[in-house]
Amino acid sequence: MKAEGYEFHNGNNSIYFVGEFDKGEKKFDGGEPLSLDYGTDFYAPQTTLLPDGRRIMIAWMQSWHNLWIPGGQKWQGMMTIPREISLKNGRLIQKPVREIEKYHANMVRYSDEVVSGRRSLEGISGRSLDVTFVITGNKYSRFTVNLAKGSGYYTRFIYDRENNIIEMDRTFAGFEKDVVCIRRACVKSAECYGDVKGKVDEQQEAQ
């Protein structure tokens, strides 16, 4: 698909349509194409329906433009974390499957923290993390988090509140090739992206 604004830039796009399917006429009346994932390492998604009614999606977490085998490994690429998907107001909502919570340990929680300038939070470190942060207030224009930072490498998450744009920058994540590292997406308002959840894993970071 041809790129439009911030949409459809990864070259191997996975898209979805929301509409009505007429079984009798065998006709689907869909709306506009929507991005399923804004990253470059997301390909060939598939879904399955669990007995409890949840629809689960998983995809190949690899890019055709960044094919390489991590040192000491015998494999190339990996699968994404399974996601629970649902529809809300005509948009697909994606969340990590709840079963992952069984593996959580060493929880660290901070509340009502005022962040000004650079800030590191004690007890939050490592290469495998499940991170949730809630951004509140309206006296800031830009919020940045550096993930998996060490030895000169990091991945940067940015929320531009004034322009309603989120950005993931992997320029300094340690790629062996000069590939597309910055991905951006628009959000409708600051309120609709106040709760940010992400997972950092050493192998996922390498991809």
Q: Where is each model-derived feature located?
A:
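Beta-rich accessory regions
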Residues: 23-207
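Short, solvent-exposed loop/turn segments at conserved positions within beta-propeller repeat blades
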Residues: 7-13, 76-77
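Beta-propeller blade termini and top-face loops
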Residues: 15-19
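Short glycine/acidic-enriched loop and turn motifs that connect beta-strands
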Residues: 3-6, 64-65
